[in-house]
Structure formats: C-alpha cells, structure tokens
C-alpha cells in the first residue's frame, strides 16, 4: 500500500468536518428530548439503531452518493432544501406541543409502538445527525479522495464518528435525571426553536447555492 496515499491527516480532517457539521454535543439535548419517554433499554436501542443507521447512511453516501443523486437527477442543493423542510416540520411539532402529546399518548398505549421506534432512523439518524450537510460533505470528500485506500480510511472514520456519537448519547439519561419532567418539556420547546432555525439555514443554504448557479 502506498503510505503517501494513506495520509492520516485526511481522516482527521474528515472526522472534525463531520463533528463540526453534526455538532453531536449540541445534539445531546435534542436526543434527550426525543427519548425522555423511553425506558433505559428502549433509549439504548434507539441510540444504537440511530448511530448504526448514521454509519450506513454516510458510508453509502461516501461510496454511491454522487451516483445515486445523478441517477435520480437530484442535486445536493435540492436535498438540502428538502431536509430543511423536514426539520422544520419536526420543529413545529416540538414547539406547539404535539410532540409531547404524542409521547403522552404512547405512554397510555394510544400510539403505535412502531412510531416511537421509528424516531431512531427518522428524524434522529436522518436528517438530524446524518443531515444534508454531513451527507453532501461526505460526497464531496469522496470526489476529492477517490482512491480505494482513502475510501476505506474514510469509512473507518465514519465508524469511529458514529461510535463517538453513541458514547455521547449514552450519557444523556443523566441529563434527564437532572432536569426532570418540567425541564425536559421546556427544553423540548427550546430545542424546537433551535431546530426551526436549523431547518431555515438548510433551506436558505440550498436556495442560495441554487440561485448562484443561475445568476
């Protein structure tokens, strides 16, 4: 193997680019808000499925991202806009209390358990963790470093990043115990506002990039 091609600085930079885009530390309150109704076992399962899904999503994006988008004629900017809209819908449900009501209904047996389980993939894994920014960055990274060695190194980096996120989310129950039910309800609405801003940023970034292509 060519040692020069296997440059570890590439993977360190890739890891920190994912860290900056995803901001897993800032995701802890969001994860806590979305899983505070779950038992410890359910929360750990959600955490595992979410981060395992993130590893798969980013790995697929790394290997097949450009091909898939081109195959369906979808631009990264369009994907960013659609992801922003989805984040905004989730944020609205958190702000107006529907998300909390769904949690209470689930506790009373009125909500399908599949709905509660599905948050591990949507919205946690995508678009909140593996969002348009992380996916598009991964695709761009694969175009710059397309050798087999670098693709393999980036895949290992993705696995390590997912394990890092899993570790951070693992300690989230401590936050739940400290804040209590009232604190979680307040934080849920605050996180809804932040998610609303994040969704708007996704949409504006996609629109700005799209407009720059035409003007």
Curated annotation (Swiss-Prot):
Q: Which residues cross the membrane?
A: 10-32, 52-74, 78-100, 119-141, 151-169, 190-207
Report the locations given in the UniProt record.
Cell membrane
Q: What is its main location?
A: membrane
Source organism superkingdom: Bacteria
Q: How does it sit in the membrane?
A: Multi-pass membrane protein
> What keywords does the record list, in alphabetical order?
Cell membrane, Membrane, Transmembrane, Transmembrane helix
Protein's UniProt keywords contain Cell membrane: yes
Q: Which GO terms of the cellular component aspect does the record hold? A: plasma membrane
State the InterPro entries in the record: Multi_antbiot-R_MarC
Family in the record? Belongs to the UPF0056 (MarC) family.
Q: What is this protein called?
A: UPF0056 membrane protein bbp_248
Give the originating organism.
Buchnera aphidicola subsp. Baizongia pistaciae (strain Bp)
């Amino acid at each position: 193997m060519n040692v020069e091609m296997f440059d570890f600085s590439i993977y360190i930079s890739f890891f920190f680019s994912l860290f900056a885009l995803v901001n897993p530390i800032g995701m802890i309150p969001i994860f806590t808000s979305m899983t505070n109704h779950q038992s410890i076992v359910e929360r750990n399962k959600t955490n595992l499925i979410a981060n395992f899904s993130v590893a798969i999503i980013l790995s697929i994006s790394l290997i097949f991202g450009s091909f898939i988008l081109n195959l369906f004629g979808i631009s990264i900017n369009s994907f960013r806009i659609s992801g922003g809209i989805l984040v905004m819908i989730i944020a609205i449900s958190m702000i107006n209390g529907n998300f909390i009501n769904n949690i209470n209904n689930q506790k009373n047996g009125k909500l399908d358990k599949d709905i509660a389980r599905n948050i591990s993939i949507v919205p946690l894994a995508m678009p909140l963790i593996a969002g348009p920014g992380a996916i598009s960055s991964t695709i761009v990274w694969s175009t710059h470093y397309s050798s087999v060695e670098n693709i393999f190194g980036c895949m290992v980096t993705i696995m390590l990043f997912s394990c890092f996120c899993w570790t951070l989310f693992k300690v989230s129950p401590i936050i739940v115990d400290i804040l209590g039910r009232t604190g979680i309800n307040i934080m849920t609405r605050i996180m809804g506002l932040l998610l609303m801003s994040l969704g708007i940023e996704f949409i504006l970034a996609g629109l700005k990039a799209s407009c720059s292509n035409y003007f």
